[in-house]
């Protein structure tokens, strides 16, 4: 998931942009005037010619999600923003989201046009997440779900997950020994998730240097595709030629490095036994000869790089940040941590490690993770939707091609849906109390993984990773604040996902 708008609002130079756009004001104003006569868009703040609401957002000095939250209070559950050349229709009501993405899911299942930088890295939208609703998307998603993310296939990777959990615990113990019990939570959690996904993706073991290099490259890619002002005002693109050149350099580095790993797997398949670390199956294996509807050719090397990068990015940071927020809540609520540990002990005793079969029996752990995903979804907005053809919603026109954004906290913290929504309370999900179908099929109450046809295909895998990782970490360690007695700062900031503004460092005390 990429951030919706993450450039600094204070970085906009108003005089510069005023000069740039002055020659276009008359033409664009007339065009907008004619458009408004044709369309009945949802309400929203009046904007300036050409730039729309960009200046208002910049002058607010707020992150985009806070700006959207303020507008929701003024304009209601569906409103319009014009951010330069992009029109955004933002939904923050559970009923409207259910109508759009579930009841009328096929119509709202496409994606809008990408900016030029992102197109470089997506191979012109050749990914499960970015592809327009159609044959390419169907082919890519069907392959990923059936061959990698089915319940049967996920079970086959059980030993890999257990091995990764053992290594995670050893890494935490080692770091704690070297730092008087103090560890970085996010760094360790995302490394464990990344290692699992690397082996699932490529089917070969890698040394730590290779793992860290791959991680570094993918992080650089994510920073490179971060939105810029010229994504919203393409007329400014000539002023960002250095950034485009840098993006092409990053892409070349990504392709060159990842293709080397791809070729290693290809050789292992062609020469069985030549790579002693090679596993019997990987995601990459399913892509080599993948048939795409409407195409005669199989994916190119560059497309393989794109699809593998999507697989890795999609599950690394979402899992890592969920664990960081989860440990933070356990530290802030020691009574919850005690209940979770007691449930683990009553389920597995003192003599063995928690495994995935145990996790399925832990009612309080299940409730804790649901509440974690409700209170701390991976991002503030779901991936952007677009309608296949102009339609209406709530009596307003929704034109084809506009960005349809779903503001997640508007639903997961709606007091009409949740009792005391600001409170972190796993008991709300215990038997006989509140519940939520995170797929959204029976009703939208929380959508940490999206809903409808474009729901995250890795939902089941992600929840397995989060449940198992939390259970092992709590079984092995008591988690305490650093410095002792200090309060946890739950302020967040948007990077690739919503992370803690002040990264969590925690004290650990081994239990067993």
From Swiss-Prot:
Q: Name one GO cellular component term.
A: membrane
Where it sits in the cell: the answer is: Membrane
* Chief location bin: membrane
Read off the Pfam families from this record: p450 (PF00067)
What Enzyme Commission number(s) does the record list for this chain? 1.14.-.-
Q: Which PROSITE patterns match?
A: CYTOCHROME_P450
Taxonomic lineage of the native organism: Eukaryota, Viridiplantae, Streptophyta, Embryophyta, Tracheophyta
Q: Which GO terms describe its molecular function?
A: heme binding; iron ion binding; monooxygenase activity; oxidoreductase activity, acting on paired donors, with incorporation or reduction of molecular oxygen
Which terms are listed as keywords in the entry?
A: Heme, Iron, Membrane, Metal-binding, Monooxygenase, NADP, Oxidoreductase, Transmembrane, Transmembrane helix
The similarity comment for this entry is: Belongs to the cytochrome P450 family.
Q: How does it sit in the membrane?
A: Single-pass membrane protein
Which SUPFAM superfamilies does the entry mention?
Answer: Cytochrome P450
| Known role | Catalyzes the epoxidation of physiological unsaturated fatty acids in vitro. Can use laurate, oleate, linoleate, linolenate and vernolate as substrate.
The record's annotation in Gene3D superfamilies points to: Cytochrome P450
Q: Where are the transmembrane segments?
A: 9-29
Annotated GO biological process:
fatty acid oxidation
InterPro entries per UniProt: Cyt_P450 (IPR001128), Cyt_P450_CS (IPR017972), Cyt_P450_E_grp-I (IPR002401), Cyt_P450_sf (IPR036396)
Q: What is this protein called?
A: Cytochrome P450 77A4
Q: Which cofactor does it need?
A: heme
**Positions bound to heme:** 456
Q: Which organism is it from?
A: Arabidopsis thaliana (Mouse-ear cress)
Its gene is CYP77A4
